[in-house]
């Protein structure tokens, strides 16, 4: 091998070593799109809302990034940030539930899988709940259910519209019935919110499944979804085995649900804030009065 070939091979190895297929990984300057294979400079991807500029694939983002996209700068005020899950059932599979909680808290910096609070969107008030898939797959346990219920109740008292950003594998099995009852609790709070003719919009992101889909994710006045998001209750394989037939390739995607009337609009992440602004104005939401 010549010296030139050696340097070329070395440069190639260094370049490839810095390419990541996971935009959430902190190391590496380059990210390879899992959909089309396009390699993008990480900073360019972030500035494009973590959407692939080549194919439009929406990469998964965390709750803080979601809030920054939706809320006006410095307007978000978090609620119930100290609520943390316990292990009432002393659940253990290969590892204890307590260990899994601790690991997720250390890995994400979150207490549990949702952040809730009040904010403004182009000066219009909004109650906001953002689920974070990094925390045990965004599963819904008692703390997630309690925080969402509380922010819905706050919105009802203040006459605020609500947006819940869904990203979840469903109910948290480690909490058993305590997890499942959150479906009814949140739904009940939303019914009281609706009784005051207030606007509720869920945003279904990839993935939204299980008990979340079977409850508050599908109760919105307007149901929004991100492109190609996986949305469903049971998994594709389970359904195919039960029905004993092949499902369409696009089954359980946002586009499939839009076509069949389960989703009202698919919103590109870059257009989310402007879309929310239009919807809030259409529904008569007034701008907050600024006080000194």
UniProtKB/Swiss-Prot annotation:
Entries under InterPro entries matching the protein: AcCoA_carboxyl_beta (IPR034733), Acetyl_CoA_COase_Trfase_b_su (IPR000438), ClpP/crotonase-like_dom_sf (IPR029045), COA_CT_N (IPR011762), Znf-ACC (IPR041010)
CC annotations in GO: acetyl-CoA carboxylase complex
Keyword check for Transcription: no
Domain CoA carboxyltransferase N-terminal: 29-292
Zinc finger (C4-type): 33-55
Cell location: Cytoplasm
EC number(s) stated in the UniProt entry for this protein: 2.1.3.15
Binding site for Zn(2+): 33, 36, 52, 55
Claim: Transferase is one of the keywords in the record: yes
One GO BP annotation of this record: malonyl-CoA biosynthetic process
PANTHER family, per the entry: ACETYL-COENZYME A CARBOXYLASE CARBOXYL TRANSFERASE SUBUNIT BETA, CHLOROPLASTIC
HAMAP family: AcetylCoA_CT_beta
The name this protein goes by in its record: Acetyl-coenzyme A carboxylase carboxyl transferase subunit beta
Organism: Prochlorococcus marinus subsp. pastoris (strain CCMP1986 / NIES-2087 / MED4)
Taxonomy of the source species: Bacteria, Bacillati, Cyanobacteriota, Cyanophyceae, Synechococcales
């Amino acid at each position: 091998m010549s010296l030139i070939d050696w340097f070329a091979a070395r440069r190639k190895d260094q370049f490839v070593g810095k390419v990541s297929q996971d935009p959430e990984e902190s190391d590496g300057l380059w990210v390879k799109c899992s959909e089309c294979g396009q390699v993008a400079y990480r900073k360019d991807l972030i500035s494009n809302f973590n959407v692939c500029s080549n194919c439009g694939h929406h990469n998964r983002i965390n709750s803080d990034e979601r809030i920054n996209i939706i809320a006006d700068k410095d307007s978000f005020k978090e609620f119930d940030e100290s609520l943390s899950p316990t292990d009432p059932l002393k659940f253990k599979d290969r590892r204890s539930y307590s260990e899994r909680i601790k690991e997720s808290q250390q890995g994400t910096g979150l207490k549990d899988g949702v952040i809730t609070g009040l904010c403004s969107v182009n000066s219009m008030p909004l109650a906001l709940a953002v689920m974070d898939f990094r925390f045990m797959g965004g599963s819904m346990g008692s703390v997630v259910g309690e925080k969402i219920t509380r922010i819905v109740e706050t919105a009802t008292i203040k006459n605020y519209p609500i947006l819940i950003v869904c990203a979840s594998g469903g109910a948290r099995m480690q909490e058993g019935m305590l997890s499942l009852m959150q479906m009814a609790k949140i739904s009940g709070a939303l019914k009281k919110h609706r009784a005051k003719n207030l606007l509720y919009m869920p945003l279904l992101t990839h993935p939204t499944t299980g008990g979340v889909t079977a409850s508050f994710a599908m109760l919105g006045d307007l149901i929004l979804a991100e492109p190609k998001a996986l949305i469903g209750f049971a998994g594709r394989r389970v359904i195919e085995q039960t029905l004993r037939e092949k499902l369409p390739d696009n089954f359980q995607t946002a586009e499939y649900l839009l076509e069949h009337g389960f989703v009202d609009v698919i919103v590109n992440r870059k257009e989310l804030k402007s879309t929310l602004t239009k919807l809030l104005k259409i529904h008569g939401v007034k701008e907050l009065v600024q006080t000194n």
